[in-house]
Design a protein with these regions (language model features):
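Conserved redox-active cysteine motifs that mediate thiol-disulfide chemistry
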Residues: 75-82, 87
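Short beta-strand scaffold segments in enzyme catalytic cores
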Residues: 19-25
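Short, basic and Ser/Thr-rich N-terminal targeting/leader segments
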Residues: 15-19, 67
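A structural microfeature
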Residues: 32-33
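A short, polar/charged loop-to-alpha-helix boundary motif
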Residues: 41-52
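Zinc-dependent deaminase
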Residues: 1-11, 84-171
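Immediate flanking context of iron-sulfur cluster ligation sites
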Residues: 63-76
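Glycine-biased flexible loop/turn sites that connect beta-strands or occur in inter-domain linkers
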Residues: 28-29
Length: 171
């Protein structure tokens, strides 16, 4: 995960959302590929760290089936990346911070363990979660500017109980 964090820090320095990924061999841990987000600099919505690392690994190995490989990523994969991980037949996934907005391994969906798919993989989240989340928090805080106080939200009136009134029955 340290190597994935290094990749995330490179992304942050480039103004990219700091997510890093590393593909490694399961038998000896040898790193086969590493990548970081490049969506902004490439104007490519698919240029997520996981997808780029999987592409590199498949190219290097000469096969798209990477069942004897693992993937470490600093943020829980989104639907696209989780799908790519399943399609690449990755044998093991390790991720750092959970993603409450897009996480599709454990948080919002469980795509990597979906029983209807033809491949499921071992996965473990929360590895170095504080460090991984910290890189993201620092990046977005700097982007927003720390000195800015949070915007006050207007108070909302409570919702009425029961169904809304029917205008056709107005008396």
């Amino acid at each position: 995960m340290e190597l994935a964090l290094d990749q995330a820090r490179i992304a942050a320095a480039m103004g990219e959302v700091p997510v890093g990924a590393v593909v490694y061999r399961l038998d000896d841990g040898e790193v086969v590929a590493s990548a970081y987000n490049l969506r902004e600099s490439t104007a490519d919505p698919t240029a997520h760290a996981e997808v780029l690392a999987l592409r590199q690994a498949a190219h290097k190995r000469g096969v798209w089936r990477l069942e004897d490989h693992g993937l470490a990523v600093t943020l829980e994969p989104c639907p696209m990346c989780a799908g790519a991980i399943v399609n690449a037949r990755i044998g093991e996934l390790v991720y750092g911070a959970a993603d409450p907005k897009m996480g599709c391994v454990d948080t919002l969906h469980t795509l990597c363990s979906e029983p209807r798919f033809n491949h499921r993989l071992e996965h473990r989240g929360g590895v170095m979660a504080d460090q991984c989340a910290g890189v993201l928090k620092d990046f977005f805080a700097a982007r927003r500017g720390d000195a800015r106080p949070p915007k006050p939200r207007p108070a909302r009136a409570p919702l009425p109980k029961g169904p809304p009134p029917n205008p056709a029955r107005a008396e």
